[in-house]
Amino acid sequence: MLSEINETFIDCDVEWWSDFENNLGELNIYSVAGEVAYENRPDLFSEHCDRTWNDAEIEVNNKLEVLFNDIIETFHEWILQLNKPTPELILDIHTQESLFLTFNYTKTLENLYGIDSKHILHIHGCIDDLEVGHSENFILGHGKDRDDILALNDDEEPNIPDGLSDEELQYYLEEFANRVELHEQLARDAAINQLHRLRKPVKEILASNLDFFENLDNIEYVHVYGFSFSKIDEPYMAKIAEKLSNVNWEISDYNNSNSQKIYHFLAKYHINNSTIISLEDILDKRQLKFDF
């Protein structure tokens, strides 16, 4: 499974896995489609040639559908096998009369902090969804739309020879535009569709959880812990900022690695009352750890 991921996405090192969801959208479409198209060229001399133009498209669809489904299933299995955290280190957080938005699929808030689940929104699903077979509520994906995918895989610009007449230039550009054969273009389109299928539907998620975001009027403090401010998940925080830009915000920054994104977010949404902290500043005396 891992070798298939490495082969398809290329350069799947530790850094790649650390930004797993975003990098799901980094698939080299043209490389995958080109390889499959090369192996599934239509036989122009066959009386059944017309039937083979879609072979590469079908193969790309099958290959990526299996790969992406395996990635999602493997991620589900990894979440399910996580051991429950042991209360050796917990954050000193205010839990009474608080609301919680979590991107964590586990039940740490419920099990370790004793928070009632009715005060928690697992925005991308909870481990319970997997345990009872409702994996459709368990959301994983990248944040790129079709334009982003196309831009990422944009073809090279034509290297136009010097001294061409207008007629020669037009012919050269037409030939350059038509250099991709039909069966390969169909394979590319299939790869784009499959990659777009793995996109996280943030707008739809926000719409289906609108009640949570519309009922924040009495909130006086916003505490943001362990959030990366990645492009893919920023819309959720932006929705909160639209209603609560005038209250006090406390945001954690791990090893000062996120400062630029945090300051950009604060400025963008006109949040003037803010404090940036390290999680070590609010740790209790015990240590939270996972046994893998």
Residue ranges and their predicted role:
Residues 22-25, 34, 114, 134-152, ...:
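Functionally critical alpha/beta secondary-structure elements and their flanking flexible loops
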Residues 6, 10-14, 141-150, 162-172, ...:
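Noncatalytic linker/hinge segments flanking ATPase motor cores
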Residues 111, 131-133, 285-291:
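Short, solvent-exposed polar/charged micro-motifs at secondary-structure junctions
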Residues 125-128, 145-151, 247-250, 274-277:
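Glycine-rich loops and low-complexity Gly/Arg-rich segments
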Residues 1-18, 194-198, 275-292:
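Extended charged low-complexity segments that act as oligomerization/scaffolding linkers
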Residues 239, 247-292:
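TerminUS-proximal long segments
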